[in-house]
Amino acid sequence: MHDISSLTTRTKTLPPLRVGVGGPVGSGKTTLLEMVCKAMYPQFDLIAITNDIYTKEDQRLLTLSGALPPERILGVETGGCPHTAIREDASINLIAIDQMLEQFPDADIVFVESGGDNLAATFSPELSDLTLYIIDVASGEKIPRKGGPGITKSDLFIINKTDLAPYVGADLAVMEADTRRMRGDKPFVMCNLKTGDGLDQVIAFLKTEGLFRG
């Protein structure tokens, strides 16, 4: 059960931070959202919107995991190409955000998880203030050097499932070097979300670059 006592005494003065979470199918977007929500709620007032093409599977998974109370998670069925719903025509997600903020007007963060997509996926600026883009090691050592907006333009780039490197022949040092070359000074995290390794860096980023940035 979630303790909401810390939420009842707060006075909200700023609009919520909108955080887009993108990445290919199976990279760990839903796991990332689950772990971040469990670590930050109820200290922070959170809501989450998940995108799936034909189902509300990610909403179901987040709810079953206890990431947030069920009423704070809303699933959106986008249909068609998932990146359209976060970029070219984000109206379905903007409506979902408005709907959730009517219920939770004091929200600190609104997470929007995109449907699984390719390396070219980006969030519309009206939908997301910060973007997290996640890939997994099992998809291949070469992924960071392929580039694409998700890798080069996201505010935080996350390389997940580092524990699988020995089993898929991936060299983490090469992936790290390629990431530095493609992103320059932009931050990235090597992590294993199943064990929580690297999660603290993601949360610190959300706080320093989002919630507490002057």
Curated annotation (Swiss-Prot):
Q: Which UniProt keywords apply?
A: Chaperone, Cytoplasm, GTP-binding, Nickel insertion, Nucleotide-binding
Cellular location(s)? Cytoplasm
Report residues binding GTP. Answer: G23, P24, V25, G26, S27, G28, K29, T30
Question: Which Gene Ontology BP annotations are present?
Answer: urea catabolic process
Q: Name one Pfam family in it.
A: cobW
SUPFAM superfamilies, alphabetized = P-loop containing nucleoside triphosphate hydrolases
Q: Which InterPro entries match?
A: CobW/HypB/UreG_nucleotide-bd, P-loop_NTPase, UreG
**GO annotations of cellular component type:** cytoplasm
GO MF annotation: an example: GTPase activity
Q: What does this protein do?
A: Facilitates the functional incorporation of the urease nickel metallocenter. This process requires GTP hydrolysis, probably effectuated by UreG.
Q: How does it assemble?
A: Homodimer. UreD, UreF and UreG form a complex that acts as a GTP-hydrolysis-dependent molecular chaperone, activating the urease apoprotein by helping to assemble the nickel containing metallocenter of UreC. The UreE protein probably delivers the nickel.
Family of this protein:
Belongs to the SIMIBI class G3E GTPase family. UreG subfamily.
Which protein, by its recorded name, is this?
Answer: Urease accessory protein UreG
Tell me what organism the protein belongs to: Bordetella bronchiseptica (strain ATCC BAA-588 / NCTC 13252 / RB50) (Alcaligenes bronchisepticus)
